[in-house]
Amino acid sequence: ERAVNADPKLDGLIGFKDLKLEEMGWEVYDFLEPVIIDDIAYSHYFTSGVMGRPVSSAKLMLQKKYMSCVMGHVQDRDVAFARKADGTNMLGLFAGIFYQHDEDYLTPQTNGSWSGIWILNEVKDGGCDEMPVSINYLREKYGD
């Protein structure tokens, strides 16, 4: 869509279907369509209200969405925890980045942010035990 928006001549010539992701077994969702798996919602980002802007913190995401949520979009990682009245644990997670390099569009304050992946263990009813794994650890263990 971004290429077509930048150059309308491409409209109808290229699209996500050309990538044949579904034919290769991928589940494909529309941008910002939350995907809920085991009572945890996943999205590129979650909105803070009717203006459609991204939430600014993991804590605010829990307050706005009332369920465990994991999102990308921002360079820094952020984690928040809450508990529902019924005792169910909730996780709010900004996943951060997985860059091995600095990005030109980032500032000196945001280049160098933590970079890695998250493993969600013991996922059940929206709760889990989150485990960060840094890119540095992965590179040391498995090589460049």
Tell where the protein language model's regions lie, with residue ranges.
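Solvent-exposed, charged interface segments at domain starts and junctions
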Residues: 5-8, 31-32, 49, 53
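Polar, enzyme-active/binding microenvironments
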Residues: 129-144
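Beta-strand-turn-beta hairpins that frame and shape the catalytic cleft
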Residues: 34-41
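Active-site neighborhood of divalent metal-dependent phosphoester bond hydrolases
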Residues: 1-29
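Short, acidic/polar N-cap/turn motifs at the starts of alpha helices
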Residues: 30-34, 117
